[in-house]
């Protein structure tokens, strides 16, 4: 099934070194934005990646991964003077992960407003706070969001907060606020809400992004699914149960499934959002069943099989 409107993804792409056995690692493509783009394209969506990589082995490897998965790389720039990002994924026994960055800043932080393509009405633009950590990528993300809204398109901002990547964490609140004000939809995790607001419980901070100017918030709750907050109310969407191997990229797969579904229509309403979140929950669940952020990102037949074999509880109105 082909998406009707193009999804533009800007930001990070990296080579992830994932533990395989003692003293050995799997070389896996990754990066939050790259994962989102590949997920959209694998599902049959039309997706373009806006970014910068080093003209090195890692950069050429990642560009080939994009091409192999059907992602448009017309606006992906390779620069011989820069080094592509490489990181080690540290996994716990239950599949939870943390990251050790071997290259920072990576080439992805050098994407600039000059790299942006022209946008069209009803298209989508995705960015996350990872793209806001350094200049000129920060300006590229914010300007891209502004131009997409000006063109009559939509913007999805994923908070995806990684404080260790910031040189000055005091910049975070203002940049999150600017991003939320530009966004049609904001996606945030429960933990991130607590980090941003200082609240002990995410429920007490669930309106944080709405209060910054974004009317639609999706809070990812891991194994508990997702909470949608709109002007119509609050709705909880349970997630399917799976055996967890590696949680790397689960949130990105969630966003990819969400964007793919939303891009199939010119306008979105509650019914389409509900379908999109159900698909997003399924994509996120599938992503954690194998090592590597992209390994288990589904193709359409795999997603359909998963949906038919996992009974998803109906969304529950919370408020």
From Swiss-Prot:
Active site: 252 (proton acceptor)
Annotated binding of ATP, by residue: 158-160, 187, 192, 220-225, 281
Name of the protein described by the UniProt record: Aminoimidazole riboside kinase
InterPro entries: Carboh/pur_kinase_PfkB_CS, PfkB_Carbo_kinase, PfkB_dom, Ribo/fructo_kinase, Ribokinase-like
Lineage: Bacteria, Pseudomonadati, Pseudomonadota, Gammaproteobacteria, Enterobacterales
Residue numbers binding K(+) 2: 246, 248, 287, 290, 292
Function: Phosphorylates 5-amino-1-(beta-D-ribosyl)imidazole (AIRs) to form 5-amino-1-(5-phospho-beta-D-ribosyl)imidazole (AIR), an important intermediate in the purine and thiamine biosynthetic pathways. It allows the use of exogenous aminoimidazole riboside (AIRs) to satisfy the cellular requirement for purines and thiamine.
Listed EC numbers: 2.7.1.223
Enzyme class: transferase
GO annotation (BP), single: fructose metabolic process
Keyword entries, A-Z: ATP-binding, Kinase, Metal-binding, Nucleotide-binding, Potassium, Transferase
Subunit structure: Homodimer.
Family: Belongs to the carbohydrate kinase PfkB family.
Induction / repression: Repressed by STM4068.
Deleted gene: phenotype: Disruption of the gene prevents the efficient use of AIRs as a source of thiamine.
Entries under Pfam families matching the protein: PfkB (PF00294)
Naturally occurring in which organism (per UniProt): Salmonella typhimurium (strain LT2 / SGSC1412 / ATCC 700720)
């Amino acid at each position: 099934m082909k998406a009707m409107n193009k999804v533009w993804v800007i930001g990070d792409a990296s080579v992830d070194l994932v533990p395989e056995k003692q003293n050995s690692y799997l070389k896996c493509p990754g990066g939050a934005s790259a994962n989102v783009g590949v997920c959209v394209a694998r599902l049959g969506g039309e997706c373009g990646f806006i970014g910068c990589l080093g003209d090195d082995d890692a950069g050429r490897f990642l560009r080939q991964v994009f091409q192999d998965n059907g992602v448009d790389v017309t606006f992906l720039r390779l620069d011989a003077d820069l080094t592509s990002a490489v990181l080690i994924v540290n996994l716990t026994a239950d599949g939870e992960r943390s990251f050790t960055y071997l290259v920072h800043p990576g080439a992805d932080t050098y994407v600039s407003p000059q790299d942006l393509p022209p946008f069209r009405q009803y298209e989508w633009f995705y960015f996350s706070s990872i793209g806001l950590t350094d200049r000129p990528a920060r300006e590229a993300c914010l300007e891209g969001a502004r131009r997409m809204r000006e063109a009559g398109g939509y913007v999805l901002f994923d908070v995806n907060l990684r404080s260790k990547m910031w040189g000055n964490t005091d910049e975070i609140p203002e940049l999150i606020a600017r991003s939320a004000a530009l966004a049609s939809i904001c996606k945030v995790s429960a933990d991130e809400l607590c980090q941003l607001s200082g609240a002990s419980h995410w429920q007490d901070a669930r309106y944080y992004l709405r209060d910054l100017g974004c009317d639609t918030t999706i809070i990812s709750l891991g194994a508990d699914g997702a909470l949608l907050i709109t002007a119509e109310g609050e709705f909880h969407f349970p997630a399917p149960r799976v055996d967890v191997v590696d949680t790397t990229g689960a949130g990105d797969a969630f966003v990819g499934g969400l964007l793919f579904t939303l891009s199939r229509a010119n306008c979105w309403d509650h019914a389409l959002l509900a379908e999109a979140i159900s698909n997003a929950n399924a994509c996120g669940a599938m992503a954690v069943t194998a090592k590597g952020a992209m390994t288990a990102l589904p193709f359409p037949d795999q997603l359909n099989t998963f949906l038919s074999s996992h009974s998803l509880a109906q969304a529950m109105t919370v408020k």
